[in-house]
Amino acid sequence: MTGLFVTLEGPEGAGKSTNRDYLAERLRERGIEVQLTREPGGTPLAERIRELLLAPSDEPMAADTELLLMFAARAQHLAGVIRPALARGAVVLCDRFTDATYAYQGGGRGLPEARIAALESFVQGDLRPDLTLVFDLPVEIGLARAAARGRLDRFEQEDRRFFEAVRQTYLQRAAQAPERYQVLDAGLPLAEVQAGLDRLLPNLLERLNG
């Protein structure tokens, strides 16, 4: 039995984790096994790489270093969590995946898409998400929400131009493959965003049972 791989993407403050947990609850109510996870991270080793990536440092991190660390964490995550869960038939709900790399390291840092694609193929083989939910909202709203949470991590300290590029990359990728992506307006009240997730549930269940 093969499970279903669902990723949740979006800029800072888009509510991915909150909505991931909501979607998990709705699926579990139907007796479906759900594996919750996140990137970078998801395993003890990958979480240590996450700490390196997010912690502010006096030594600037080169963009290629950042990219390679992302994929190093992803390789461990795939081996330790994602592939085993899919093999069990679980629904994997992952807060960020490779679309975030295209958005942050590609759009934000300006690294070539071909470089990211080469690493994607090397690390993931033919594994791609079955469905990607993009939680979209204006940059200023997302940054205000992130600031309200407290101390900013290394990415959250980037400037507005960086996050505008991140947002546009997400939207461009969603437009290029509408069969895989669903864009949700994360600027709406939470109850309305979650009503949108409820409307997606039949599609999710059909994919899982198909």
From Swiss-Prot:
GO biological process: dTDP biosynthetic process; dTTP biosynthetic process; dUDP biosynthetic process
Enzyme Commission designation: 2.7.4.9
Record bears the keyword Cytoplasm: no
Assigned keywords, A-Z: ATP-binding, Kinase, Nucleotide biosynthesis, Nucleotide-binding, Transferase
Residues noted as binding ATP in the record, renumbered to the chain: 10-17
InterPro entries: P-loop_NTPase, Thymidylate_kin-like_dom, Thymidylate_kinase
Catalysed reactions listed for this entry: dTMP + ATP = dTDP + ADP
A Pfam family recorded for this sequence: Thymidylate_kin
Transmembrane intervals: none
Keyword Hydrolase: no
Top-level taxon of origin: Bacteria
Function: Phosphorylation of dTMP to form dTDP in both de novo and salvage pathways of dTTP synthesis.
Protein name from the UniProt record: Thymidylate kinase
Organism expressing this protein natively: Pseudomonas aeruginosa (strain ATCC 15692 / DSM 22644 / CIP 104116 / JCM 14847 / LMG 12228 / 1C / PRS 101 / PAO1)
Phylogenetic lineage: Bacteria, Pseudomonadati, Pseudomonadota, Gammaproteobacteria, Pseudomonadales
Gene this chain is encoded by: tmk
